[in-house]
Amino acid sequence: MLPFPAMNLKKSRSENSSVASSGSKIEEQTEKSAEPTTIKVQKKAGTPGRSIDVFAVQCEKCMKWRKIDTQDEYEDIRSRVQEDPFFCKTKEGVSCEDVGDLNYDSSRTWVIDKPGLPRTPRGFKRSLILRKDYSKMDAYYITPTGKKLKSRNEIAAFIDANQDYKYALLGDFNFTVPKVMEETVPSGILSDRTPKPSRKVTID
């Protein structure tokens, strides 16, 4: 079984208090987990969504989750995990005999990333934001100049206008987003998302 890249989100305090035994869901942060990696999401003041602040990868052999220190390292593992599987021993001083760094449970909100996605071009940053209703994540790229780009058309236009970044290949910008694992979403959020039955008026 291929290990998946994933992300983890924590809950805000208010969410923690409203969701029983939700553990570390959004607690102002969220951790990730996925097949090869996991990500943690943190709610930032003034930000309408939640962003990832923890990355993790699952060992191909023992299936334990290992935290990944940086987004760059995480993206490197994710980009080649299909040809070069991740094992606990990949991390210096770690083996399958050691206790896992994270447990896949509802104490955190997990999002599963897609293996094989390309690394973000040098100088740019890929950002993921979790929607307030936890339905999905949105992806965008931040340029070296601090501009936020939300589509490949915007990226192409930026590179055309800024030839210093022509080294960045358009194919290395990917807007595929991780899958939010619904069983790890706070129950209070799920109930809020449940559509209410419509009231039909019958006219005799």
From Swiss-Prot:
Renumbered residue ranges of the record's region Disordered: 1-46
Organism in which the protein naturally occurs: Arabidopsis thaliana (Mouse-ear cress)
Its domain description in UniProt is: The methyl-CpG-binding domain (MBD) functions both in binding to methylated DNA and in protein interactions.
Q: Where is the composition biased (Basic and acidic residues)?
A: 25-34
Cell compartments where the protein resides: Nucleus
Output the Gene Ontology cellular-component terms: histone deacetylase complex; nucleus
Polar residues composition bias: residue spans: 15-24
Could you give a GO molecular-function term held by this entry? zinc ion binding
Chain ranges of the MBD domain: 110-180
Q: Does the keyword DNA-binding apply?
A: yes
UniProt tissue specificity:
Mostly expressed in flowers and buds.
* Disulfide bridge partners, by residue number: none
Where along the sequence does the record place the motif called MBD-associated domain (MAD)?
Answer: 58-96
Please give the name of this protein. Answer: Methyl-CpG-binding domain-containing protein 1
Taxonomic classification, please?
A: Eukaryota, Viridiplantae, Streptophyta, Embryophyta, Tracheophyta
